[in-house]
A protein has these predicted regions:
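N-terminal subdomain of nucleotide-sugar transferases
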Residues: 1-44, 70, 100
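Short hydrophobic segments within beta-strands
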Residues: 6-9, 38, 78, 106, ...
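Glycine-rich, highly charged phosphate/nucleotide-binding loops
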Residues: 51-67
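An aromatic- and histidine-rich active-site surface loop
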Residues: 75-99
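A short, histidine- and acid-enriched strand-loop-helix "catalytic/donor-clamping" loop
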Residues: 80-84, 101-120, 135
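Membrane-proximal helix-turn-helix segments that form the acceptor-binding/catalytic region
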Residues: 92-102, 119-135
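Donor nucleotide-sugar binding/catalytic pocket of nucleotide-sugar-dependent glycosyltransferases
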Residues: 126-127, 131-161
Length: 161
């Protein structure tokens, strides 16, 4: 099976992140599937803010092209609940749903998982994302309960580290 999996760079020289580590582990330990890594997210030394606009637009074009080239692939979408990723990733996930492709959303913690006060826009986006009819995977049973209680998600499973 072809699986498109999103994560920042898997090169530890470029990016030291929990998401990258988990994705690398998944790819390295599931040889029966063909993984297509789609690099999404900034590198550790890369500037953020407005400097991310052009790379993001380029990534959107590449993402659309990849989805059209691999319509039968399963998308394993890595989703950290941080301010920037909530806004960015909701658009990428919407494109997957619009193509009618199967998707699993793998939640990788983040500030908004435990924050009491989430800005209105991000809260609306999160509620919309977690209402999608796709399976969600969290890294612990505590995260599963939090996602269900806080965002109303229905289909959430635990895949502990």
């Amino acid at each position: 099976m072809d699986i498109i999996i999103t994560a920042p760079s898997l090169d530890p020289e470029q990016n030291v992140s929990g998401v990258s580590s988990v994705v690398k582990f998944i790819i390295d330990n599931n040889k029966e599937h063909y993984y297509i890594h789609f690099e999404l997210g900034k590198k550790d030394r890369e500037r953020g803010g407005v400097f991310r606009l052009f790379p993001l637009l380029k990534a959107l074009r590449q993402w659309r092209h990849l989805l059209k080239q691999t319509p039968k692939a399963l998308v394993h979408y890595s989703f950290p609940l941080s301010a920037a990723s909530v806004i960015r990733d909701s658009l990428f996930m919407w494109m997957v749903r619009r193509q009618g492709m199967k998707m699993i959303v793998h939640v990788h913690g983040g500030l908004y998982l435990t924050a009491d006060n989430i800005p209105w826009l991000q809260r609306c986006i999160l509620k919309k994302v977690f209402s999608m009819p796709v399976p969600f995977v969290a890294l612990s049973n505590t995260e599963v309960d939090t996602i269900k209680d806080k965002f109303g998600a229905k289909d959430v499973s635990s895949l502990p580290n």
